[in-house]
């Protein structure tokens, strides 16, 4: 297993959601620096009590859901990357030759926004809290894009939020992940290294396991009560002409194997499907095609993954992290 540096919670910037909502110029500057230099930052939610209450409520709901028998959960399997249930061991994992070891449940933003009638029962039964939480986090991430656009001097159709029009189809979704307790890693482990496909990711978890890759090696990203972890995805990196950093990360047990059930809530903001940008090779691609190619690559074997840069978004070469320096 790779050498992992000690916790780096003090090394990542902590930004105030309240100050960003208030359009504080200094906080917006710090936001840009964090997204360009680290690609990750902590977002202080402690002034937003309802958001934290809703997170705790959703966590309890999803724990009960994941504890249901597999055959019951498989009724929500839609064979989709944005909707429904997916069992463990469907993609390549952290260890060579072994699959991942997490299960997930996804709720599409398109479904919630459009109030479709075919939502999974667990969502339909608790629609108020799912709807309120997703809409608030969605608005927070659009606000963050607006602050980045403003600070970088981007105008009109060139603003980042203009690629996220509300009425257009998108791969955006709310995802819940469970890394089940294990006695061994022989059946799979963790979540393989990757960059996120979309614009911004909003993570909440009270348990350790998330690591990001730096030029010095793998570093823990410590959970902090009352804070979300936000990170830049490939689409935002490409839309920013690679000024902003989509950083490689993974999830691993803290010890030799997963000693307790680990839960994560993730909101993945992604551009509208037809948004177009240049990828790492300079090719024009749509957000939908980049998303679909990347998720197909997640399911490929480790040997197949080594023949393409898409899983790491072009941020790794010969097992080394590529760092793009930000000049203020």
From Swiss-Prot:
Biotechnology: Pneumocandin B0 is the starting molecule for the first semisynthetic echinocandin antifungal drug, caspofungin acetate. Pneumocandin B0 is a minor fermentation product, and its industrial production was achieved by a combination of extensive mutation and medium optimization. Inactivation of three of gloP/GLP450-1, gloO/GLP450-2, and gloM/GLOXY1 generates 13 different pneumocandin analogs that lack one, two, three, or four hydroxyl groups on 4R,5R-dihydroxy-ornithine and 3S,4S-dihydroxy-homotyrosine of the parent hexapeptide.
Name of the protein: 2-oxoglutarate-dependent dioxygenase gloE
One Gene Ontology term of the molecular function aspect: dioxygenase activity
Gene Ontology terms describing biological process: small molecule biosynthetic process
Pathway stated in the Swiss-Prot or TrEMBL entry: Mycotoxin biosynthesis
Binding site residues for Fe cation: 194, 196, 249
Pfam family, one: DIOX_N
Classification via InterPro entries: DIOX_N (IPR026992), IPNS-like_FE2OG_OXY (IPR044861), IPNS-like_sf (IPR027443), Iron_ascorbate_oxido_reductase (IPR050231), Oxoglu/Fe-dep_dioxygenase_dom (IPR005123)
Residue ranges occupied by any Fe2OG dioxygenase domain in the UniProt entry: 170-271
